[in-house]
Amino acid sequence: MCGRSGLISTAVCPCATGLICQQRICRQPSTYKISVLMQLSEKPGPIGVFDSGYGGLTILHQMRNILPHYDYLYLGDNARAPYGARSFDVVYQFTRQAVIKLFSMGCHLVILACNTVSAKALRSIQQNDLPSLDPNRRVLGIIRPTAECIGSITQSRHVGIVATEGTIKSESYVLEINKLFPDITVTGEPCPMWVPLVENNEYDGPGADYFVKKRIENLMIRDPQIDSIILGCTHYPLLLNKILKYTPRGVKIVPQGEYVSNSLKDYFVRHPDIEAKCTKNGLCHYLTTENTDKFRESAQLFLHERVDVENITLG
């Protein structure tokens, strides 16, 4: 379950969330006009879920399993994906555009269902933008819930992280886990080809075997004592069969969806004011910045169902 807020820096997070406040780079307050505050509806709305691509659908899928009565609005910035190798500032600007869009469509709570976004943009959004956009709305990330749970999973106290280059370079998992569990050794392995394998529907082919085997072997060579591997990218559950194939026997694989969803459930118990602003009709709507036919086809890989989707423009 999600614990109380713990920041990487000494700055205070204005939203006091129980999920993550991750980014280590502070920026100047947003120049976005305070008048936006007056334009946002106070009526309850869906839970916003944002990802740069399709991976966040694995988080959404678990949310709908564990919290099925809520309404969800998923936004995928597929036209500009992947975010993994982009700079902190570019990821922040793209994420800010998405959050503003979801707020304008009635969301009072937005989940950044992307590790790169949670690592590179969350803290700036929380500290610099929410006070002017609407201090009563919330933007939460997905790294903290995973970090909180790993302490009860690892026995050797040696944990591996497989993630995008951006997430690994941010050291968000290392810092968050070490803050919660100083006795745990964390080793990160960047996997730059894994997201393209999923996005191009090649996650079950021979190319996937090559790239997954290479990265898992690299990780285990660097620290043979690892007994738990966190899938630090929401795309990676689709590679689970390949990952299990090349992971040594006895090493646990830790996907994020279940932990993030249970953390959100716990968050609602502790924040009934936010929970009351989330509508409950069991509905889900999808938005994408790319071709809707492509999104619809790719989404079926993650959700195993056909979805209705609307094209939008960000920026």
Regions found by a protein language model. Give the residues of each.
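Cysteine-centered motifs
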Residues: 2, 13-15, 21, 26
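Acidic, Ala/Val/Gly-enriched low-complexity intrinsically disordered segments
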Residues: 11-12, 16, 36
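Short, Lys/Arg-enriched N-terminal segments with co-localized hydrophobic residues
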Residues: 27-37
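Short, low-complexity interaction segments enriched in Ser/Thr/Pro/Gly
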Residues: 5, 17, 30-31
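Extracellular/periplasmic carbohydrate-active domains that bind, remodel
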Residues: 4-7, 235
